From Swiss-Prot:
In the N-terminal section; belongs to the protein kinase superfamily. The active site is at residue 395. This is Probable SapB synthase. It comes from the Bacteria. It is a single-pass membrane protein.
Amino acid sequence: MTAATVRGGTPRDSVVSVSNRWEGAGVNKGYAVYCDADPYFYDAPHRTADRTGAARSRYAAASSPVPEGWQRHESGDWLALRPADADLPAQGWKIHVSACLDNAESVLDRVWRHCVDGGTAFKFVPSRYLLHQRNAKYADRAGSGKFVTVYPADEAEFERLVGELSELLAGEPGPHILSDLRIGDGPVHVRYGGFTRRDCYDADGELRPAVSGPDGVLVPDLRGPVFRIPEWVDPPAFLRPHLDARSAVTVTGMPYTVESALHFSNGGGVYLARDTRTGARVVLKEARPHAGLAADGADAVTRLHRERRALERLSGLACTPEVLDHRTVGEHHFLVLEHIDGKPLNTFFARRHPLIEADPGERRLAEYTDWALDVHARVERAVAEVHARGVVFNDLHLFNIMVRDDDSVALLDFEAAHHVDEAGRQIVANPGFVAPPDRRGVAVDRYALACLRIVLFLPLTSLLAVDRHKAAHLAEVVAEQFPVDRAFLDAAVEEITRVDGSTRVDGSTRADETTRADETTRLDVTTRVHGAPDAARRPAGPVAPVRPDDWPRSRDSMAAAIRASATPSRTDRLFPGDIAQFATAGGGLAFAHGAAGVLYALAESGAGRDEDGEQWLLERTKRPPSGMPLGFHDGLAGLAWTLERLGHRDRALDLAELLLDQPLDHLGPDLHGGTAGLGLALESLAATTGQAALHSAALHCAELAADGLPGGSVPADRVSRGRARAGLLYGGAGRALLFLRLFERTRDSALLDLARDALRQDLARCVRGAGGALQVDEGWRTMPYLGAGSVGIGMVLDDYLAHRADEEFARAANEIVAAAQAMFYAQPGLYRGVAGMVLHLGRTTATAPGTGPRAVRRQLDALSWHAMSYRDRLAFPGEQMMRLSMDLSTGTAGCLLAVASVLGDAPAGLPFLPPPRRSGGPLTRPHQEP
């Protein structure tokens, strides 16, 4: 139940002006598991069974009658059973049992009988599909392998059950659960943690599952991919041999010294190492048995052997690494490969791309085009050489292409490779390169090469998961921006959009025999980015029904798409949005990703109130979800503020009363979920209702938000809690916004001083990049965005400068404008994409060049590059762009609000950041200008 805001970016060693915008080339693997349940929207994985053949994979035990005197509860990925009179502790030692796909049902039947006969509470993953998903290559490593959880009543029963289950399941294979201590070499594991759900805030103000320490104070129950025992817990003596055995297995006996980790997945790690015998650098690829499953069920060890066979067949080619060694340590397998000295293509070409600049010249565009075409030709030749040796690569994408200093290329990661005589489909894939399921053999590689033609110029092919015909639009944009031969792009579009189930093993096709690709029934738990039902068969035409700058048609179209997506029968969410809806209690209601933010955007943009949606929210807030955070973007404060804004004062005040009853000193100081957001909401409610208690609470929030500032009054033991962050949602800018709004209410200049100090803290975490653009430096990447980047700081700087002149701040505000002027941003969203740039450029009072209507129009045009269609209405993709989103933070509602801020008759704005007063009315519609 973490307040998850997914963050991405490229490495900090990239050129500053590049790294902040190229995160679309990176992939947050956590999103993939939310793609199976719906072809258009992210949804909870357990809902997949409602629309696919996954329901047939449900274990018989999941449908068995509830034993007499027992209670049954199914939630998410788990089905729990417990005796009605069970008296379990809140925390303690619990037992996890792992299993493979083939023995899981047998393991479950035995554990079920043992627990029911003994009156022991337990829960289990109820279907083969969900178990496959939990053990997939890029599933959450902290939860990987967990199939059955058993809850002993005390330590004596814990020891007894560990022994009995170990004997009962002796010899059964199962993956090692990384978060647990393994008992012997079987599938039984143990861990100390919470039995019942309790929550506390961690050092960063994030809500986490909790256990209580010896003093009764709740602390985070750490659930990472590493076995940990709380420092106050003494493990039972019978665990000592297993703890010793765990420590005994190391790689010290191998003639390789690990220098750094390059990558982790459920299947194991990839490490940069050095051969101690020769001093040469090598790459170690680790594989864990029964873990890291691909779509075909192959585990990491099976795929490692596939890679070894493929690379040995390709030995001698300059475009593939040599196999140097193969080792086994315990049950872990290691493949030792030649180290290719170069950089992955995603980072290499990002340094060169001209669209990250505000105004690249013709020469710059031409030079980049020549380089990109040369790289594609080299990759195409490399793939042809691989095919000539009888191997299909089957996983070509930017991260698997290494570019050396001389621009020669090498292909990496052959774990999905197979012989050309096998008509194999993709079993692992990058979302931007997922071939349709009708492609087999070398046709998979040809599809990836076609995607690469577009990605080298415009890395937005993840959108093809929703509609493959988006390729034609992307090609048009590329042709408009770069001097590239249109035939080069047309060939890519033809390959991407064709529908041909008759693809032969050698990749040839029969053009006169086309069949519809069934993109909705492929149960693929690794790629999870199948297209929408009409993605392959829809006739060519505009992917988006209207341009964003065609106002008010675009407003009406976006609003219609949002309303068409509503699911009022659901209790967890009304509008589909980011996966964060499922990470926090009440996430589907909250302002950032839930109904509150969407309803706000509809009302503020002039699209009209959604009375049915408001009634849905009122019904769900009669009794807010247990464990819902308190914050503005993620919790109760945002709900209270939104309902007051929409005219539902009684419910707003009910929620405000809940806030007043809660201790707040454990919260972080930020705007997203901390005291800055609470203070702003409470002060706004105080102003509209006249309730003095709300104003007093807002002032208390300001005191807490002053944590760590020179003028703050918070005790020293609370100063500088958590990691330092900058920006509107998580940094000093959000706190400064609270101080500014309270200053406007009280005229207390000390609050203005606090705002100054908070903004200075944020500016101290910024760096200047190419063109003088000021961006937040996170240590390994830089960020220009509205939520966690410099543009959000610029919004608050503008408001501060309205009250007090400051030369340093005025200069910074102008430099931040440059961060909002690039020609390309990887995502469209409000807080992490183009929409935020539109909103800032339309609102800023900075005087730097690039703040006028022309700059806004250019970003509106860039926003159109991401535009999609949902039921023939304008919609936008969410985070990672594998599915559409309707929420405010990442999706269509946020884009609607941003466009309304510059084109609406009554300009819209973010909460607490009102739009500027414009004497001349809305911006001239770009499509109406000469």
